[in-house]
Amino acid sequence: MKTVIIEYSTIIPNVLKKIITNAFPTAICTWKDLDEDYFEFTVFGVLDLAMLEDVIAEYM
């Protein structure tokens, strides 16, 4: 499991979910609003966390 906080101006959650599920077909993504500028994004079901971090790092 990996949880990060991302700014909406960087990427929206639905697009990030699509990118991650294309790269990791077993991934399950959830998110929740923190405020109008940020959301908390969590990914489950990915074994290669280093590669997942590389993908997410582009949007943090």
List each language-model region with its residue ranges.
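Helix N-cap motif at beta-to-alpha junctions
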Residues: 9-13, 42-50
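A generic structural signal for beta-strand entry/edge sites
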Residues: 1-3, 36-40
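Short amphipathic alpha-helices in soluble, non-transmembrane regions
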Residues: 19-21, 51-60
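Short amphipathic alpha-helix segments
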Residues: 7-27
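RNA-recognition motif
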Residues: 30-36
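Charged low-complexity stretches with an acidic bias
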Residues: 4, 24-28, 57-60
